[in-house]
């Protein structure tokens, strides 16, 4: 698989959804072979409003005296949301509940860096 989206889906079947929000441009990708517990409209607003706000707040706190911010994981009722700050925005990956997104974090970050998706605010 040649694209970063395909590579993320190839990591584990537990990756259900991938979104890139960069410089005001949003691209959302759903694994084609599964249903999603959320609507694409709510996902759209999550990527535009919720995830940037979470990263801003956690990043500001992380930069005070915590050594920065690497990523955030949110545990919703039906899935986990892994949010990685990236230049000009973020990458968001939904994992099924069968996965532990923290256990996948290093693999995800390495993959993103291999595709030159660079972190923002990491110290």
What are these regions, as identified by a protein language model?
Residues 1-123:
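Non-catalytic interaction/Regulatory regions outside core domains
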């Amino acid at each position: 698989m040649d694209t970063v989206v395909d590579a993320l889906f190839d990591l584990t079947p537990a990756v259900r959804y991938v979104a890139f929000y960069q410089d005001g441009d949003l691209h959302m990708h759903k694994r084609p072979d599964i249903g999603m517990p959320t609507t694409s409209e709510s996902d759209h607003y999550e990527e535009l409003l919720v995830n940037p706000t979470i990263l801003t707040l956690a990043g500001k706190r992380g930069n005070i005296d915590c050594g920065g911010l690497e990523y955030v994981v949110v545990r919703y009722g039906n899935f986990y949301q892994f949010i990685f700050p990236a230049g000009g925005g973020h990458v968001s990956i939904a994992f099924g509940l069968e996965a532990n997104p923290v256990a996948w974090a290093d693999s995800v970050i390495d993959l993103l860096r291999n595709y030159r998706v660079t972190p923002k605010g990491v110290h």
